[in-house]
Amino acid sequence: MSKLWGGRFTEEAEAWVEEFGASISFDQQLVNQDINGSIAHVTMLAKQGIVTKEEAEKIKIGLQYLLEEAKQNKLHFSVEAEDIHLNIEKMLIEKIGEVGGKLHTGRSRNDQVATDMHLYLKEKVEHIMKATKQLQTVLVHQAENNIETIMPGYTHLQRAQPISFAHHILAYFWMLERDVNRYEDSLKRINISPLGAGALAGTTFPIDREYSAELLGLNGIYENSLDAVSDRDFILEFLSNSSMLMMHLSRFCEELILWSSQEFQFIEMSDQYATGSSIMPQKKNPDMAELIRGKTGRVYGNLFSLLTVMKGLPLAYNKDLQEDKEGMFDTVKTVEGCLHIMAGMLETMTVNKEKMGQAVTQDFSNATEIADYLANKGLPFRQAHEIVGKLVLHCTQKGIYLVDVPLATYKEMSSLFEEDLYEVLSPYAAVKRRNSAGGTGFEQIEKALEKAKGLTKEAIKN
């Protein structure tokens, strides 16, 4: 077939060269955005008198027809037409005649594709924010059910201090809240229009870029035509934000994997989110959590890939930028899928409160409570720390725990120890006393839950 840009060429490319250069196999995902962008563009052309109202109406009817066909997956794309833009333009001309060729007046594929991706990410970022809020709602429900579920808090994967399981869950709520905030802020950069920037230098036609942007639901235009067609920082920002979100999901999945093991037995995954072994009948593997953890590297790779593509590109457009899309599409699909799986996995998991409770009665995670006890009685904390360290050593040598040490032995270490010491050794009491802002104390958790519920309700309302 003859190319829409083929006027200055005398030889046709080999089929394998065409296939190598074509992007229609993946950029067809932009079909809705491409057609909607074209409808806005031709509407503007008519308003400015660049095409007649009759021509614009004919073009819009043709585009609306193609849009409906696209929604029903009835469009047939060709490699010969290279990309989504030329495929749609070719179909339009076939449908309505040569007047369809006027659609591209005052526009280049360079600003067209950038516009498509802005519209695509606008939609997808809003979807991801909503899905993240749904996951946060699941976290809130689990936290509400586990305010008084006591578990070990860890540093260096060693038991450190007793905490509420709700407090642990809510830590991820706030990480996700920052992820949502980052996505929301990125919409300021996504919701601007490159349309009308042309190939790189603008156009000689009297277009109205602000009007086109308004028709597309965007909040403004790029101020520089070179910048509009040549940068992909809005995609990089999306990939960066998605990498951080996936990192948070991956960290939580790592813990879920550990907690579901026989060594911990803190939780049990629903059968819906686990798999078995082809050889070992007893196995119940946390495959979905492992897959989310694994797919995190995939999203990181998409970020690093585009950063590497961009780092050496002179202004303005270069064909290298064709490589900006597949990683973006893949990241959207990956993040949406992981959020959906994560929400279901957390909603259906069983919490083994008894095992968590046992874990904080057979360790030394209450050692800090004794140091605080002495400090509250006026002893410098460093001296209190030294005394408690010796008490822990004494216990490990005897094979006992701090609660088993008789008061007489405590008094040998410090005369400040009294009978009330044993009250602070209870994990429940230890958690309850940590009532500083943002702490694991039950009162603080109730406050955090109220705030968290308010944030999720507000998001659902919007």
Curated annotation (Swiss-Prot):
Chief location category: cytoplasm
Assigned GO CC terms: cytosol
Subcellular location per the Swiss-Prot or TrEMBL entry: Cytoplasm
Keyword Membrane in annotation: no
Pathway(s) of this molecule: Amino-acid biosynthesis; L-arginine biosynthesis; L-arginine from L-ornithine and carbamoyl phosphate: step 3/3
Keywords: Amino-acid biosynthesis, Arginine biosynthesis, Cytoplasm, Lyase
Gene Ontology MF terms: argininosuccinate lyase activity
SUPFAM superfamilies referenced in this protein's UniProt entry, alphabetically: L-aspartase-like
Catalytic activity field: 2-(N(omega)-L-arginino)succinate = fumarate + L-arginine
Known EC number: 4.3.2.1
GO-annotated biological processes: arginine biosynthetic process via ornithine; L-arginine biosynthetic process
PROSITE patterns given in the database record: FUMARATE_LYASES
Metal-binding among keywords: no
NCBIfam families: argH (TIGR00838)
Family: Belongs to the lyase 1 family. Argininosuccinate lyase subfamily.
Protein name: Argininosuccinate lyase
Gene this protein is translated from: argH
